[in-house]
Amino acid sequence: MDKYIYVTGILNPNEARDEVFSVVNKGYIGPGGRSFSNRGSKYTVVWENSAARISGFTSTSQSTIDAFAYFLLKGGLTTTLSNPINCENWVRSSKDLSAFFRTLIKGKIYASRSVDSNLPKKDRDDIMEASRRLSPSDAAFCRAVSVQVGKYVDVTQNLESTIVPLRVMEIKKRRGSAHVSLPKVVSAYVDFYTNLQELLSDEVTRARTDTVSAYATDSMAFLVKMLPLTAREQWLKDVLGYLLVRRRPANFSYDVRVAWVYDVIATLKLVIRLFFNKDTPGGIKDLKPCVPIESFDPFHELSSYFSRLSYEMTTGKGGKICPEIAEKLVRRLMEENYKLRLTPVMALIIILVYYSIYGTNATRIKRRPDFLNVRIKGRVEKVSLRGVEDRAFRISEKRGINAQRVLCRYYSDLTCLARRHYGIRRNNWKTLSYVDGTLAYDTADCITSKVRNTINTADHASIIHYIKTNENQVTGTTLPHQL
């Protein structure tokens, strides 16, 4: 069956084609395209090379693409009661669905049937004519009574006695002697979950949960860590999303967001204890690292961000001072290279890669270079690290530590992953020239078990032995910031 006839409900092929292309054209779609989403399915219609293209929908037939684009552009995705996948399959299908069309208003798969659609046309016309002269409430009453009786009823006249057809259905259930009634806790949980799904069936509420998805994901990770759960507990995800939307604060500062997420988690703890008799450990201090930092948060809150990062992928020692050191060095790098608009994560990775290449020795015969060439958004930029070196020296002098080494040992896992991702294989060890270059940095001995199963264990063992037994200390001239 012709796709254009199918999607428009117009039986004349030429008229159906004209109707489709009155909507599916460059002018209507616009230069930026149009996006649509429903129940997790997302599509974007764009005009490309004199034809419509749909992100999220592919077909070898251009007429099928045009038909589905017409369906989207006419608002079909937002008005249909069917699952978007079913709509895709209907448009793709080549079989004749004429009989199916006759059950829909105007034969369109996105059209909604009116409550009086089963009445004869004359009765429907009478109801429509009566609605024009009746008040809204009387018009609604007229339609409801007419539908129930099965014919048009004039509610302004004396109603004659009639029999209203009612159908009583008896539901037969098979019950075993041991399952006559469910435990109260199970019944309560079923009612709770049913009510939740009814609340989430609202498209606006469901769409709003996307705006808090980052918080829902991190909160779920917190619960999985605290309890013997898996990330597939969909009901927990649904509750998280709904409560985060309902309780979202107007003030979105970091401290308020922490209190907001903790309020939701506290409610979930109560639900878990009520239905499953499980106590969830962890308080606001444990939760705080799982609350994402936003780009608009002030600098002084960056230490919380790095506490979160260290919470997930670091070794244990230095846990108290490393987030503070990271915050100070990252802030210095971002301030010194403000024109590059570095994010905190980018800045931290640049610092770790820099010291993995040039070492973390407190004193050196050869100065570390002041700049590192970094590809940012497709362009190679010179990133200045002179300020980072100076700040690290001051921290080291004040605390009596090697701040660079403490930091890099603490984030050694992240360094390893960054070197592997960016293909950095620089190896300054002549005696270990054979090892994997991505592991050839002087804090590789601090790689934890979280990453160890992804690296060459033999090379890693050689590096650990070399670092622990190496007596060739690097000494000599003072650092550039000591001049």
Swiss-Prot record:
The keyword Transmembrane helix applies. It is found in: Host membrane. The chain crosses the membrane at residues 342-359. Signal peptide: none annotated. Its main location: host cell. Keywords: Host membrane, Membrane, Transmembrane, Transmembrane helix. GO terms for cellular component: host cell membrane; membrane. It comes from the Viruses. It is a single-pass membrane protein. This is Protein P55.
